[in-house]
């Protein structure tokens, strides 16, 4: 969860979410960081407390009944997809199908390298995300999965329970052409950022074409 000035305690997220639900808000969203970037240290002089979004959302789930619990964005290259599938399905059952997962490759290569050290050398986060999305999709829809990719492998993996939500609601982040292709193939939504209204109109038209290529539509 991204640190903000008015949240001094991780449990403040629960109290804010309870109040948001009482006020009629639809959803709460959590960001995902494993490590502190250099520019953050320069700006703040210390490392902020980045809490786990999935664990925080699980706590919020126990204190709410209607709020959708969402990430924007969970960084897929940080995680082994087989283990993540289990965590997501468990959380979706705990919250009664309210989980919505925004995913991305991560904004900062520096953070990826901090987590993986020398093992990060030569790894392509976009390709890792493609494999993760394919694996998660299969694990959520197939009884048994064998997958051999460049970065991830599973063998005769039966991942149960499946999430309550079917199809599982992936929201794909990223402004790039690759991000849009992922959204068209796997997403129920696309999470871009920084576009003007005119640019966004053009991007939606491009996304519609990509969806048609996948046999899908904006409707």
Spell out what each predicted region is.
Residues 1-219:
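Active-site-adjacent structural elements that line small-molecule/cofactor binding pockets in enzymes
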